[in-house]
């Protein structure tokens, strides 16, 4: 029998015409979005298989990469793309201290791709009226972004809002108040988009975690019979903001 390696396998789901979700072994999700002139992959996952070959099988268009935040499970193998969209502050950090981003690139990476700075309101034109608009939502990282896709009535949130059972803030204990405050401010800033995107498909960076993170429940997810389901949606933004306020006011314990 042929040997199989889960790390090299992908699960591909057609979300809607022109949008595919690609899940890796690490429960990370990335999204291929097509326009008429080019396609954009939002994040990369951590899979070790032939990602560029998979993309070529899904679309005939040239594919660029848009990154929600510079963690390894969202921009691994970014050097395989000719152009990478990344928040302007993250590009500055990468150029100042590249060793801090070593896990985001392959061990054999020899040179960085073209890095295109983005920020609040930036627009990535894919052709045919398909545009990815950038909305900043700090918290998970200082400069996390969400990509809003009006043409497909979808938004790609990475880890900015959370994934089902968790919103992960990475900080030292003495930085907790500052980090939670930044997340609350980011959520408050993002609220202005809610009337526009409330009924869109909210597509997060770890779709399987919307069914819980217990590995015993993962087979339920893949077989389509989950007993737990907490999808990302507009209400989660409001819930997270309320939780931040409760933490900062010590109405809930840290």
Predicted feature residues:
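Active-site HxH/HxHxD metal-binding segment of metal-dependent hydrolases
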Residues: 46-126, 220-239
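Short N-terminal helix/helix-N-cap motif within the alpha/beta-hydrolase-1
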Residues: 24, 49-50, 75-77, 142, ...
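Conserved beta-strand hairpin/beta-sheet module of binuclear metal-dependent hydrolase folds
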Residues: 7-57, 147-163
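C-terminal regulatory/interaction regions
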Residues: 235-254
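Short alpha-helical
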Residues: 28, 49-50, 72-73, 132, ...
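Metallo-beta-lactamase
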Residues: 2-17, 39, 46-47, 83-138, 141-232, ...
